Amino acid sequence: MNQDRLRDVFDGAFSRIALARKIVTPRLMLKEIGVIKSIGTGIAKVSGLPGTCFEEVLKFPGGYGIAFNIEEEEIGVILLGDHSHLRAGDEVERRGHVMDVPVGDALIGRIVNPLGRALDGEAPVISSRRMPIERPAPQIMDRAPVTVPLQTGIKVIDALIPVGRGQRELILGDRQTGKSAIALDTILNQKDENVVCIYCAIGQQASSVAKVVAALQENDALSYTVVVVTEGNDPPGLIYVAPYAATAIGEYFMEQGRDVLIVYDDLSHHARAYRELSLLMRRPPGREAYPGDIFYIHSRLLERATHLRPELGGGSLTALPIVETEAEDIAAYIPTNLISITDGQIYLSPTLFQLGILPAIDVGKSVSRVGGKAQRPVYRAATGELRLDYSQFSELETFTRFGGRLDERTRTVIEHGRRIRACLQQPESSPVSVSEQIILLLALTAKLFDEVPLENMGEAERAVRAVVLNIPPELLARMEANESLNDADRHALLWHASTALDGLGSAHAKA
């Protein structure tokens, strides 16, 4: 009996082995393996890989690279990691695909490098899907108009330079004028807006990145944010691919029908990294030693930001690229390139920054070319004359420095403009809600603040914002919704604002 059972076991095992031999056919795996000819700063010259495609990933001992220059005898490769251990003669293997990055919800709340490797000391990122970092931008017929506002929580931007979901709005200014602070405040304001945020640090100092991450953690913003980091001491190749990897992560969420905000901080470092790589590869230099395709590398990046049609999910990718100017020269090469690519710009003036006017946004040099159509109707009604009044004030204030005598009308315009400027000032990391902004803007347009002494403007603003707690819930709902306010609503809000300003110099009569 035992022999029969043993025979059955062996017969079953051998029959499965025979079946497996019929099904499985041994195959030879063809691999192309080349060798390193020379190593430079962040690049390598490789020979022996004739089938390599442009931007294909190559495997080095202990790291990866991307085929950047395809020549007859050799390939120029940009290295994506430490190359101090590499030597001439080391083997290089083709991977057969372009560079990709892990995408998905597993990345939210994580700090990673452009390769998807965790930098936050936690477990590796595990994702079932990867996407190539370089993808064609959506076709024209796949795009929808920008019609939904992206609230930044910054009064001067939401009122005068509105940003829409799917827009590309450039932030530019000299060093240390608050560019990153504006982008960070915008991320903080998306807390209850169901927007996935991506902060891409491009060649930044480690201390600057740590400060941003700390601010995100303190304000509980890391729970809806992905941080993609390259530091200044990273290889130029890794810095170069960082914004493309971050955009691929954002495109995944956009294609799921979600709204995404991505901040590139900053593209000046990206342009310099690309210039360094191009010069190392001996590509012909052009203006300011940048290669001839410097415009193209930024346009193909920023054109991926859009608002998709409802048939494609209706998701959006809003881009806030940052670029640094030198000595207030917004007509320099890289800034003008980006101004022409984007849908508007927010310019931060070092002069205003030195005067303590924060955020130091120069309204005269800032514009939003498509965001106005997405602005809430209640904002358009509240800010109808505000931009004109502020522009007139800025022009007249320049002439007052010459010490000439001013007529009554000019003095009125200047005093009104000073109160607009004071009311639009805002400390960092202090976003203002839609309802608070609307009542402030209505009070400014109605000139309720004109009787308030300048030194009391901070107190007056806080008093007006506090009356939001006393506004009927149905009126608050209309303010928050994308609806216009009728005359009765407007008068009710102005009455609340005027009441709050009693004792600070304002009068009921102006309401």
From Swiss-Prot:
The reaction(s) this protein catalyses: ATP + H2O + 4 H(+)(in) = ADP + phosphate + 5 H(+)(out)
Record membrane topology: Peripheral membrane protein
Function: Produces ATP from ADP in the presence of a proton gradient across the membrane. The alpha chain is a regulatory subunit.
Pfam families: ATP-synt_ab, ATP-synt_ab_C
Assembly, per entry: F-type ATPases have 2 components, CF(1) - the catalytic core - and CF(0) - the membrane proton channel. CF(1) has five subunits: alpha(3), beta(3), gamma(1), delta(1), epsilon(1). CF(0) has three main subunits: a(1), b(2) and c(9-12). The alpha and beta chains form an alternating ring which encloses part of the gamma chain. CF(1) is attached to CF(0) by a central stalk formed by the gamma and epsilon chains, while a peripheral stalk is formed by the delta and b chains.
InterPro entries: Alt_ATP_synth_F1_asu, ATP_synth_asu-like_sf, ATP_synth_asu_C, ATP_synth_asu_C_sf, ATP_synth_F1_a_nt-bd_dom, ATP_synth_F1_asu, ATPase_a/bsu_AS, ATPase_F1/V1/A1_a/bsu_N_sf
Gene Ontology CC annotations of this record: plasma membrane; proton-transporting ATP synthase complex
GO molecular function, one term: ATP binding
Annotated site location: Required for activity: S366
Protein's organism: Nitrosospira multiformis (strain ATCC 25196 / NCIMB 11849 / C 71)
Family statement: Belongs to the ATPase alpha/beta chains family.
Name the UniProt record assigns to this protein: ATP synthase subunit alpha 2
Keywords associated with the record: ATP synthesis, ATP-binding, Cell inner membrane, Cell membrane, CF(1), Hydrogen ion transport, Ion transport, Membrane, Nucleotide-binding, Translocase, Transport
Cellular compartments annotated: Cell inner membrane
Positions with a binding annotation for ATP: G173, D174, R175, Q176, T177, G178, K179, S180
Upper classification of the organism: Bacteria, Pseudomonadati, Pseudomonadota, Betaproteobacteria, Nitrosomonadales
EC number(s) stated in the UniProt entry for this protein: 7.1.2.2
PROSITE patterns: ATPASE_ALPHA_BETA
